UniProtKB/Swiss-Prot annotation:
It catalyses: ATP + H2O = ADP + phosphate + H(+). Residues 257-279 are annotated as: Disordered. Transmembrane segments: none annotated. It is an enzyme of class 3 (hydrolase). Belongs to the heat shock protein 70 family. It comes from Plasmodium falciparum. It comes from the Eukaryota. PANTHER family: HEAT SHOCK PROTEIN 70KDA. This is Endoplasmic reticulum chaperone BIP. One of its GO terms (molecular function) is ATP hydrolysis activity.
């Protein structure tokens, strides 16, 4: 099943196997050609960063063959946010508090803008020696910061890695529920902020929407915002339902404006991944 029908050799000494593997790895690093031998190094744990709500947003999955490189675009969580904190973790759990912090750095100097507008590209690069380099770049200004994480400082032992993998399997259902709750909360909050900006920003609908419709949206948004602040323990289903209730009020008003000359583009619903995860 695991060796394409071939019978594995059970007669080799374990110590010899380690020695053979080390010799092969040395040859690969030195660029020597090895006939009929393929030895692949992989990432022992998933690598990612923390996003809003303490979510572990994965960039490089566990067992990815190295060297490897992966980029993903993120944005800001607050209006006029001047900086983002990049916290790098390894682990398999849904929340970063249950994973292992490898390092962190701050990218500052982000020009004032509404939340979700700045584009921050985060790139993870793992070289053939397992050294991780993380860089964050503000695509608007070109400013960037980074960090290099080596294998000899602050990394987990083999036993700790195995424990993290076992814990991820043990708490898989609990982690799934936690992730769904945080994502549902973020979706509702994003929609609330999007609707507020839409009816108050002159570049969007402020000059096109009727006063009564604007007040209807703002009233529904305030009710949802108050509910969210007073129900921090709400589960994902309650959060999703609250989002649907808010959309039921806002979307017909927005849709009504489509047919007007110079009307707006369609507004996304709260459960769509409009831009990117927020930092």
């Amino acid at each position: 099943e695991f060796f394409n029908g071939k019978e594995p050799n059970r007669g080799i000494n374990p110590d010899e196997a380690v020695a053979y593997g080390a010799a092969i790895q040395a040859g690969i690093i030195l660029g020597e050609e090895l006939q009929d031998v393929v030895l692949l190094d992989v990432t022992p744990l998933t690598l990612g960063i923390e996003t809003v709500g303490g979510i572990m947003t994965q960039l490089i999955k566990r067992n990815t063959v190295i060297p490897t490189k992966k980029s993903q675009t993120f944005s800001t969580y607050q209006d006029n946010q001047p900086a983002v904190l990049i916290q790098v973790f390894e682990g398999e759990r849904a929340l970063t508090k249950d994973n292992h912090l490898l390092g962190k750095f701050e990218l500052s100097g982000i020009p004032p803008a509404q939340r979700g507008v700045p584009k921050i590209e985060v790139t993870f690069t793992v070289d053939k020696n397992g050294i991780l380099h993380v860089e964050a770049e503000d695509k608007g200004t070109g400013k960037s910061r980074g960090i290099t994480i080596t294998n000899d400082k602050g990394r987990l032992s083999k036993e700790q890695i195995e424990k993290m993998i076992n814990d991820a399997e043990k708490f898989a259902d609990e982690d799934k529920n936690l992730r769904e709750k945080v994502e549902a909360k973020n979706n509702l909050d994003n929609y609330i902020q999007s609707m507020k900006a839409t009816v108050e920003d002159k570049d969007k609908l402020a000059d096109k929407i009727e006063k009564e419709d604007k007040n209807t949206i703002l009233s529904a948004v305030k009710d949802a915002e108050d509910w969210l602040n007073n129900n921090s323990n709400a589960d994902s289903e309650a959060l999703k339902q609250k989002l649907k209730d808010l959309e039921a009020v806002c979307q017909p008003i927005i849709v009504k404006l489509y047919g007007q000359p110079g009307g707006p583009s369609p507004q996304p619903s709260g459960d769509e991944d409009v831009d990117s995860d927020e930092l």
